[in-house]
Amino acid sequence: LALDGATGELRAGAVRRGVREQDVSGGVALASSPLPEGRARFWFRDVQSGGDKIVVRQDRVIGPILSTMYSLNRNVLKMSAQLMPLSEREPRTVRLEVRSVGAEWREVAQSPWGGGYTALLRVDNWDSSRVWDYRVRYRDSAGIDHEHIGVVQSDPKDEPGFTIAHLSCVMPTARGLEGGTGEAEIPVAEPLGRYTSKNLHFPHTELIGNILSHKPRLLVCAGDQIYEGNPTSADAPDNPTLDYLYKWYLWAWAFRDLTRSTPTIVQTDDHDIYQGNLWGNGGRAAPTEIIDVSGRAERVRDQNRGGYVYGPEFINLVQRTQSGHNPDPYDPTPIEQDIGVNY
């Protein structure tokens, strides 16, 4: 049923009776996504559901710990825990506990969550000769404990070889969701549609299943984990942090069952920091130029002359969320604007 919020008048509704349980399996979602030529927009408030066919699955609830990634370099374990957005009034402490087979859990590290709602955990003198279970724990302001469980693999240094999975240029959709229905560009082509399996890649189920079938010992993500214009156009003011986190969460959510138990190295690239090209130029800010925007002069940064378009606060937040768990750099000295390094 859809009711007018002001008058309570019934606007639309449908009732089906005698529906078999297997015919209504799945989730329930509401979306406001009109075609580009449409002008109406909607929002939803106080959404409720009920009935014998509605089941709450706590094992499918997302958050507050969204995902983890880790790397193991000789005897140093580094792990990042990506949390969902939290109030500044919520507790800060995130804990890492581990256990070997048949043993009890014991705490080995703790860290406050910081920029990007990410906690960075570190354990020196790690025993890399064995496999360890781990859980990341977070206690919220209501005293409820939440956990995210995974496996730290042993160092494969004595194995004759191992498989590396390589990813880059990951897009949640083939075409942006604001671009209409995706009519075929040539007569013999099949249209993609909008909310179809041909257009929607997220949550990358087939891709991840194929990767897992190879049992990789290392996952390397070489850049463009996100695209600023996908699945929706970039909302990029002076600091596009909120828009970035939305798109980064899609990646972290989709790949979390892979990264929770596979050592992972992540390198950021141009689209991760909302640029179409990136020549770092020692960390300098990209020079500005004046362009015409709808009849008015506007000063913008020219990425193709080298440097960064956005400020160091945003750049470092992206690197923290994506690469904060990478092995220590050879030389941690930051480049200009105090931008961190990963090499």
Could you describe each region identified by the protein language model?
Residues 30:
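Dinucleotide-binding Rossmann-like beta1-alpha1 core, especially the glycine-rich loop
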Residues 1, 6-9, 13, 17-23, ...:
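Metal-dependent phosphoester/phosphodiester hydrolase catalytic core
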Residues 25-27:
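Noncatalytic modules at the cell exterior or secretory-pathway interfaces
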